[in-house]
Amino acid sequence: MSRRTLPPVRILGIGAFGVAVLLSIVGVPVTAAQGTTVFAVRTDGSLPVDAPFDAAWDGARPTEVVLSGQAVVPPRLLVPSVPVVRVRSLVNDDQIAILLEWDDATRDESVLAVDSFSDAAAIQFALGNGTSICMGQQAGGLNIWHWKADWAADLAGRRDIEDVHPAMPDDRHFPVNQGGQGPGPDGFLTGQMAGNPRSAALRTSSVEDLNAVGFGTLTPQTPDGQNVSGASEYRAGVWRVVMSRRLSNGDPNDTVLRAGSAATVIAVAAWDGSRGDRNGQKSVSIWLALSLPQKPMGLLDMWPFLLMLVLALVLSGLVMLYGSRQPAVGLGGPSSRPDWGGGE
């Protein structure tokens, strides 16, 4: 009697199941959210882009997105610091706003100490078909909106090392020019003079607009291309962050957002500064779909259909008029048989 052997497909299935069970036992999430769609809600008037807790957001149903730890490249994160992010979106004729909400026991908005890291969140948009979710690729890049809690705190006034160590002596101090032009000819602040966005003397937004085409290629857009706004608020252990942008801006480095078009492919990520999250150490989702509703049609938009309806009615009327002028056949009218004479 021959021995039965398992087919390769079944062996792989059993192996995958065993790995899943093992990861579940040690507390590592096996998958992130699958096949999730975020439905933007159309609203009339302005969007609450500066008010994360505005009542208008209650009209947008939150989509719960499960995150996994980024475990592809170092610094890795096996267990996500932020397990779930709730995503909502509102849109009008000109603008889109996306709200990210997640639970966080601490409010981390300073990076001035060596061992302090900021809370953060990001939304990435695929710029091509088949784009890798891991920072994109040359054949299909990413447009990334990156909100940083420390940048949000700097909007009220840029903080510096003196805020952490106010009595620290120094040999020579070059004060930062709050006009954003650098410290002047006698100063030497390399980051600011090189135009590093992280060293900027002034913050105009808490969100950085970036692009990437693979690992190690994350690049901020030029100052003129920074067109994403941000607003955030921390309440009772919950972060709410709103990122917004005009739907159409003509920037080739930005994602194209068009109401009623095919769903836009996005992903989200979150960082918990109190747990040392920074750079690649983050909680991430898989690809999601962002669906923007079709713009309601007005009378001007409906003119082709109205024209077709009028033409159809005119043609129907002409057909009926033509038919009414034809002699009736077989309905009691004069006989069409010839008179041969001599008939009965």
Show which residues each predicted segment covers.
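Long, well-ordered hydrophobic secondary-structure segments characteristic of membrane-embedded
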Residues: 75-105, 110-114
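A mature extracytoplasmic/lumenal domain signature
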Residues: 91, 102-104, 127-129, 245-247, ...
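Extended serine/threonine-enriched, polar tracts that run as long, contiguous segments within proteins
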Residues: 215-253
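Short, well-ordered beta-strand segments enriched in hydrophobic/aromatic residues
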Residues: 51, 95-104, 239-245
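Early extracytoplasmic/domain-onset interaction patches
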Residues: 48-52, 56-59, 71-74, 79-86
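Acidic/polar low-complexity flexible segments
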Residues: 5-7, 27-58, 113-203, 250-344
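Surface-exposed, low-complexity/disordered Ser/Thr/Gly/Pro/Asn-rich loops and linkers
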Residues: 190-225
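Bacterial N-terminal signal peptides
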Residues: 15-25
